[in-house]
């Protein structure tokens, strides 16, 4: 049995080792393609070991260097970090397998470069998850941005380069102009950047200034895709579908909402936010983003574009839970990181599988195609039901807890927002399924079988189902997060 110190080293370094070895393993494509899934399994085992220790009340730590008095380069795993680490490492296994099938099926160029940067992105996500303070989080948040740029621009077309410029300008711009000053503000006000249970800003900053500091964090974390800092996400859909899965489920956007939740719980403290009302404005902005992005999603005929706006909406569920700042709402937001990851990666896997097997990208082209690709469309159906929040799928737990949190905190209007959002979700997520299974075929295409792009979405769809029945482990970590 490995020690916690060893487990943390393995969890942080295994993806980096995969990235370094990938160019050398490319002499045999099968070696290169096996490195990602194997690295994912190793990283996930380490993440499970660390998460179990956190559940037992420990705080696994890995000290690297002392930078200044009260400021260290250190990793320390919180219950929230343990959850994000499990999501990032666990889904990397299936995403790596899927990437092999997708890249081979489409005969994509630069597959070695793609696999290497994919692993670097997972390394950065794990470091963000296990960061011990705001400095470490900020550094690896930036590394995650830069490591995903080559993935977004992978096709090297003019459209991809334009998307890459927008991606970098928004994510780097917001982090440097807004997030970094917020981190400096916390340091100057408190003399520390550590994460502490219950937060520590109460009594350290003027309550009247708390909404401004929170705004710097909320908009500085561009990866959370709050409106109007959201345009990078739909633009990034020009990337190959495995990148979309990485952006939407495994690493990038989850790093964004993870950062906001971390700041709310471990820096501000939910009691401080609730007592001062400093996050009230964020509740309403999140509600607006939830509905506005859902309405935009309805207008999109491109499958990935529709899913992109769905992601913007679902991310704001998590921000909403953080902003409500009650125990049950924060737990619901935390669980939604897990549930949305499983459901949304299923949907993107299915979108990519349809493209690889039939070269279809438009919802209007899917009429009758469900009978040609039943496993893919069935997986899409299950993933959609989880995102909508219908039992017995995992997404129903997190949405239920968010609704309870809204009512308990007196936000009755938010209950209506969540209900309306679910109705909109039903419309725009189930349309591809209804077209695929229940409409006559309008376009005859040759469907080629590619098991490596079909098996992963089926497995993640099953995961979305299992998460409904086996939610206790994640729920216990989420509860520990707000009572520790």
Where in this protein do the model-derived segments appear?
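Cytoplasmic/organellar membrane-interface segments at the starts of transmembrane helices
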Residues: 371-376, 426, 430-484
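Hydrophobic transmembrane alpha-helices and their helix-loop junctions in integral membrane proteins
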Residues: 94-112, 118-137, 147-435
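Alpha-helical transmembrane segments and their helix-start/interface "positive-inside/aromatic belt" motifs
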Residues: 30-40, 162-172, 373-377, 451-458
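Transmembrane helix-loop-helix hairpins at membrane boundaries of multipass inner-membrane proteins
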Residues: 1-9, 20-116, 191-200, 262, ...
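Membrane-interface helix-loop-helix modules in multi-pass inner-membrane proteins
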Residues: 55-58, 62-85, 134-137, 141-152, ...
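Hydrophobic alpha-helical membrane-insertion segments
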Residues: 38-51, 173-182, 383, 459-469
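Small-residue-rich transmembrane alpha-helices that serve as helix-helix interface/gating elements
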Residues: 12, 339-342, 419, 460, ...
């Amino acid at each position: 049995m490995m020690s916690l110190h060893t487990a943390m080293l393995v969890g942080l370094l295994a993806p980096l080792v995969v990235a370094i070895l990938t160019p050398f393993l490319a002499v045999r494509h099968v070696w290169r393609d096996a490195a990602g899934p194997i690295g994912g399994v190793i990283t996930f085992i380490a993440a499970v070991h660390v998460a179990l220790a956190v559940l037992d009340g420990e705080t696994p730590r890995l000290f690297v260097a002392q930078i200044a008095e009260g400021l260290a380069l250190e990793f320390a795993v919180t219950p929230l970090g343990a959850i994000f680490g499990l999501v990032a490492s666990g889904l990397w296994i299936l995403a790596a397998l899927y990437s092999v099938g997708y890249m081979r099926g489409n005969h994509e160029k630069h597959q070695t470069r793609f696999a290497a940067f994919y692993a670097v992105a997972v390394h950065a996500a794990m470091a963000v998850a296990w960061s011990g303070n705001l400095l470490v989080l900020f550094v690896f948040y930036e590394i995650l941005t830069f490591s995903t740029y080559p993935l977004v621009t992978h096709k090297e077309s003019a459209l991809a380069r334009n998307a890459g410029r927008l991606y970098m300008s928004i994510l780097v711009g917001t982090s440097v102009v807004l997030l970094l000053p917020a981190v400096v503000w916390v340091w100057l006000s408190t003399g520390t950047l550590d994460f502490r249970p219950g937060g520590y800003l109460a009594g350290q900053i003027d309550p009247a200034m708390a909404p401004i500091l929170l705004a710097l964090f909320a908009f500085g974390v561009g990866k959370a895709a709050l409106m109007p800092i959201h345009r990078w996400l739909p633009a990034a859909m020009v990337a190959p579908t495995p990148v979309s899965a990485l952006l939407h489920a495994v690493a990038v956007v989850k790093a964004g909402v993870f950062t906001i939740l971390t700041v709310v719980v471990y820096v501000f403290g939910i009691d401080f936010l609730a007592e001062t009302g400093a996050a009230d404005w964020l509740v309403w902005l999140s509600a607006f983003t939830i509905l506005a992005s859902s309405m935009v999603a309805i207008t999109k005929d491109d499958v990935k574009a529709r899913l992109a706006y769905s992601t913007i909406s679902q991310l704001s569920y998590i921000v909403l839970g953080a902003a409500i700042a009650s125990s049950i709402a924060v737990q619901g937001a935390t669980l939604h990181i897990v549930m949305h990851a499983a459901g949304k990666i299923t949907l993107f896997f299915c979108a990519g599988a349809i493209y690889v097997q039939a070269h279809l990208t438009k919802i209007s082209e899917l009429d009758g195609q469900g009978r040609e690709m039943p496993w893919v469309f069935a997986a899409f159906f299950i993933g959609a039901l989880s995102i909508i929040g219908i039992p017995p799928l995992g997404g129903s737990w997190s949405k239920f807890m968010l609704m309870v949190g809204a009512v308990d905190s007196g936000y009755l209007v938010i209950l209506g927002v969540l209900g309306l959002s679910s109705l909109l979700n039903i419309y725009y997520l189930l349309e591809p399924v209804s077209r695929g299974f229940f409409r006559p075929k309008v376009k005859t295409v040759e469907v080629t079988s590619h098991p490596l792009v079909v098996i992963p979405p089926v497995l993640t769809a099953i995961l979305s189902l299992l998460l409904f029945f086996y939610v206790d482990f994640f729920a216990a970590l989420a509860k520990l997060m707000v009572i520790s």
